[in-house]
UniProtKB/Swiss-Prot annotation:
Keyword Transit peptide: yes
Motif extent (Cx9C motif 2): 64-74
Protein family per UniProt: Belongs to the COX23 family.
Name the UniProt record assigns to this protein: Cytochrome c oxidase-assembly factor COX23, mitochondrial
Gene behind this protein: COX23
GO biological process, one term: mitochondrial respiratory chain complex assembly
Lineage of producing organism: Eukaryota, Fungi, Dikarya, Ascomycota, Pezizomycotina
Amino acid sequence: MSNKPAPKSEDKAEEWSGPAATRFDKYAATQPHKAYSEYFDPCQEAADKSIRCLKRNGGERAMCTDFFQAYRDCKEQWQNARKEARRNTSWFGK
């Protein structure tokens, strides 16, 4: 056992309103070279629907094949778009 005092509820509230609460925002602001796509998955809705289908059907994958295929199609389309965008940019700038 440690001799650390138990954290006060005030400390926990401060933790979520202090600098730790904005850590991601600060990181994103300091990383302007990061593309928006690295923080946002356009296929998240399809992924969520797949997971909801699995939960609704007790894990029976055969019942959710349409949702899985929709996710695969979305992901493939997104990856192809990203590849094309990278192909059209130069190594030394925009």
